[in-house]
UniProtKB/Swiss-Prot annotation:
Transmembrane segments: none
Cystine bridges: 55-113, 59-65, 62-115
GO biological process terms on file: guard cell differentiation; stomatal complex development
Keyword Heme appears in the UniProt entry: no
Signal peptide annotation: 1-26
Organism, as annotated: Arabidopsis thaliana (Mouse-ear cress)
Keyword annotations from UniProtKB, A to Z: Developmental protein, Disulfide bond, Secreted, Signal
Domain of life: Eukaryota
Family per similarity comment: Belongs to the plant cysteine rich small secretory peptide family. Epidermal patterning factor subfamily.
Protein name, per record: EPIDERMAL PATTERNING FACTOR-like protein 1
Intracellular or extracellular location(s): Secreted
Xref: InterPro entries: EPFL
Gene: EPFL1
Predominant location category: secreted
Length: 122
């Protein structure tokens, strides 16, 4: 009878600790107020970079169709119009172009959908 009483005394504190521990740990976690939609929108706009587009049904039934980042080609023209009415074009001075290209480290990236070595527009 003493053995049953002794084992009960050992199990009772263990059971109490197991029952109380989840409740205590829930009190220790910091409670954060709910985020308003305006704050969430500002946080999304403040994030750098862009998010990948959905490539669902973009690769002509090729699977897996995945969004990847690819370098984009510069869109600026190397020729400028002299007179809009004359239709003539002139190349800008090469020294100006060289200076601008020399110090430019901007490498624009864009998104494409990729599947089996082929690229598709998202």
């Amino acid at each position: 009878m003493f053995a049953i009483y002794k084992s009960t005394l050992l199990l009772l504190p263990l059971i109490l600790i197991l029952l109380i521990t989840p409740q205590v740990s829930s009190f220790l976690q910091p409670i954060q107020p709910p985020i308003s939609p305006q704050v969430a929108l500002i946080e999304d706009k403040a994030r750098l970079g862009s998010t990948p587009p959905s490539c669902h049904n973009r690769c002509n039934n090729c699977h897996p169709c995945m969004a990847i980042q690819v370098p984009t080609l510069p869109t600026r023209s190397r020729f400028t119009r002299v007179n809009p009415f004359s239709g003539g074009f002139v190349r800008p001075p090469s020294s100006l172009t060289t200076v601008l290209d020399q110090y430019s480290n901007y490498k624009p990236m864009g998104w494409k959908c990729h599947c089996n070595g082929h690229f598709y527009n998202p």
